[in-house]
From Swiss-Prot:
Active site feature: H95, E167
Residues with PTM Phosphoserine: S213
Protein's name in the database: Triosephosphate isomerase
Enzyme class label: isomerase
Keyword Protein biosynthesis in record: no
Length: 253
């Protein structure tokens, strides 16, 4: 049985004061880590403080991206060594906004995935199709290609620890979401790709999230599906009450 993982991606929202207030409100109310992984992926500036404020609790802290190098002349970047030193647990890699706005490629995402494992971070690896690709019937091919390239060079044991987030690009922040059945079909296809590349055991162990306009009102429909093990949530993770409803839904799946 795969443990659900509900991760809030705050993107570029909140001040430090607001972030700390949020964490203080929810950290004692999230489900036990043994039942659900409850994660907040916050802006870099807040990570140190939030990790300190959540030590000893069941709320875990993640980053939204990172560089693949440990150090070097990469102005403005943050390395996996820095994140690990802060006590960060998870890192989102290859989000469509990073791919579209900051020229991330499948190759750079793969370098980051390998670096995350080298430094003991758990990658949340994003994949998903555009509306044009979906309408052209290319969803499975696009997602399979992204997953295969992102996981290249990993061992089956590493793949078991990874998280994949299927986020159809047309559903991110639009209020539109895939149907639970359609999302499950794509997540099942992702699992079959992992099985082909790394074996049935790795495919059975890897956790696959759905993302794209997930909110308290629809999360249970997604979590009830066979191949969906959690959610990567944007806007609905910004308010404490909403986030708590999301992670509580994970507890009952």
């Amino acid at each position: 049985m795969r443990k659900p993982i509900i991760a809030g991606n705050w993107k570029m929202h909140k001040t430090l004061t607001e972030a700390v207030q949020f964490v203080e409100e929810v950290k004692g109310l999230v489900p036990p880590k043994a039942e659900v992984d409850s994660v907040i992926c916050a802006p870099f500036l807040f990570l140190d403080r939030l990790v300190q404020n959540t030590n000893g609790t069941d709320l875990q802290i993640g980053a939204q991206t990172m560089h693949f190098a440990d150090q070097g002349a990469y102005t403005g970047e943050v390395s996996p060594v820095m994140l690990k030193d802060l006590g960060v647990t998870y890192v989102i890699l290859g989000h469509s906004e990073r791919r579209q706005m900051f020229a991330e490629t499948d190759e750079t995402v793969n370098k980051k995935v390998l670096a995350a494992f080298t430094r003991g971070l758990v990658p949340i690896i994003c994949c998903g199709e555009t509306l044009e690709e979906r309408e052209a019937g290319q969803t499975n091919a696009v997602v399979a290609s992204q997953v295969e390239k992102a996981l290249a060079g990993l061992t089956p044991d590493q793949v078991k620890q990874a998280v994949i987030a299927y986020e159809p690009i047309w559903a991110i922040g639009t209020g539109k979401s895939s149907t639970a059945e359609d999302a499950n079909n794509v997540c099942g296809h992702i699992r079959s790709v992992v099985a082909r590349l790394f074996g049935a055991e790795a495919a059975e162990a890897i956790r696959i999230q759905y993302g794209g306009s997930v909110k308290p009102e629809n999360i249970s429909d997604f979590l009830a599906q066979e191949h969906i093990d959690g959610a990567l949530v944007g806007g609905a993770s910004l308010e404490p009450a909403s986030f708590l409803k999301l992670v509580e839904a994970g507890r009952h799946e």
